[in-house]
Regions:
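Non-catalytic interaction surface on structured domains
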Residues: 24-27, 45, 71-72
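Short alpha-helical
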Residues: 12, 37, 64
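Alpha-helical elements of the RecA-like P-loop NTPase motor core of helicases
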Residues: 15, 19, 40, 71
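Thioredoxin-like thiol-disulfide oxidoreductase module
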Residues: 33-50, 75
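Structural micro-motif
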Residues: 47-56, 66-67
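Non-catalytic, surface beta->alpha helical segment in thiol-disulfide oxidoreductase systems
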Residues: 58-75
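Local sequence-structure signature of Cys/Sec-based thiol-disulfide redox active-site neighborhoods
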Residues: 1-29
């Protein structure tokens, strides 16, 4: 399973989402949107419609934010 999470510095929901993934022993790749290059890739992937973080993708499908991830893990 390929998991990507887009985050920003000082984001409590980002920290919680990463904690949730870790609690389920799910490896993930983190992209920090505080970094200009990673932010550009994010907007290239999603457009500028999504403005909140975290954003989680599983196998290249957008799951959404923290609450969406929680719901996905409980399915």
């Amino acid at each position: 399973m390929k998991v990507e999470i887009y985050t920003k510095d000082h984001c409590i929901w980002c920290d919680r989402a990463k904690g949730l993934l870790n609690a389920h022993s799910i490896d993930f790749e983190e992209f920090d949107l505080s970094n200009d290059e990673e932010r550009f890739q994010f907007y290239e992937k999603l457009g500028d419609n999504v403005k909140t973080v975290p954003q989680v993708f599983i196998n290249d499908q957008r799951v959404g934010g923290y609450q969406d991830l929680r719901a996905w893990l409980n399915e």
